[in-house]
Amino acid sequence: MTQRSLESKGAENVICTGGGPGVMEAGNLGAAEAGGVSIGLSIVLPHEQAPNAYVTPDLCFNFHYFAIRKMHFLMRARAVTVFPGGFGTMDEMFEALTLIQTGRMTRVPFILFGKEFWDRVIDWQALAEACLLYTSDAADERS
């Protein structure tokens, strides 16, 4: 994505993360090391740190409300990647999947990293058997 972002001079296909540490920081760092820009959409909470140092300064945004932050994540998304995480990650993931399933959001590539984690957390087969998830909702499964 950063290569495409560089080709458009940072106008399209820009890496966007939650601006925090860990995997989010790695995404911003990768964009910076490639000479690109990246967006950080941070949430203002008493226990949260400041945005990571690799977010492009002019593209660092602080949100007080989760709903508005999620809206900004999803309205421009060309792909969604989700790594193992807690309740915040689950909330963002299921909101995005619901919006895609109900046609409120354009269908985009949706990639879950860490198959073993997701298979333990979500019983995909049980959802399909209960007709709550359809095979048309799922794409290729890769390890």
Predicted regions and their residues:
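Active-site/ligand-binding-proximal alpha/beta "capping" segment
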Residues: H64-I111
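Short, acidic/small-residue loops that bind anionic groups at enzyme active sites
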Residues: G35-E48, F83, L97-V121
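Single conserved hydrophobic/aromatic residue that forms the stacking wall/gate
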Residues: Y134-S143
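Glycine-rich oxoanion-binding loops at beta->alpha junctions
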Residues: P46-M75
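Glycine-rich beta-alpha loop segments
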Residues: M1-L41
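Alpha-helix termini
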Residues: T2-G10, I100-R104, L132
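Glycine-rich, charge-decorated loop segments at or immediately adjacent to ligand/cofactor-binding or catalytic sites
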Residues: A26, W118-E129
